[in-house]
Amino acid sequence: MAKEEAIEKDGEVIEALPNAQFRVRLENGHEILGLLSGKMRMNYIKILPGDRVKVEMSPYDLSKGRIVYRYKN
């Protein structure tokens, strides 16, 4: 069985939570829990409320996602 493709959406960080977790509001208005990806942690990329980010979500659980990119302002 092939692995399902991740869904990529853009959003804005609303709130920073403990353990590199963030509340993210997507462009369609939904709010999800965003976790910082491992490569972003390794490269010390900081995320602050108000930042625009790209989130990957699994088609099986649309309430959580992985933050994979922070857009430059």
UniProtKB/Swiss-Prot annotation:
Q: Which SMART domains match?
A: S1
- One GO term describing the cellular component: cytosol
Give the similarity note. Belongs to the IF-1 family.
Keywords assigned by UniProt, alphabetized: Cytoplasm, Initiation factor, Protein biosynthesis, RNA-binding, rRNA-binding
- Per the record, the domain of life is Bacteria
Its function, per the record, reads: One of the essential components for the initiation of protein synthesis. Stabilizes the binding of IF-2 and IF-3 on the 30S subunit to which N-formylmethionyl-tRNA(fMet) subsequently binds. Helps modulate mRNA selection, yielding the 30S pre-initiation complex (PIC). Upon addition of the 50S ribosomal subunit IF-1, IF-2 and IF-3 are released leaving the mature 70S translation initiation complex.
Domain called S1-like: residue spans: 1-72
**Quaternary assembly:** Component of the 30S ribosomal translation pre-initiation complex which assembles on the 30S ribosome in the order IF-2 and IF-3, IF-1 and N-formylmethionyl-tRNA(fMet); mRNA recruitment can occur at any time during PIC assembly.
Put simply, this protein is called Translation initiation factor IF-1
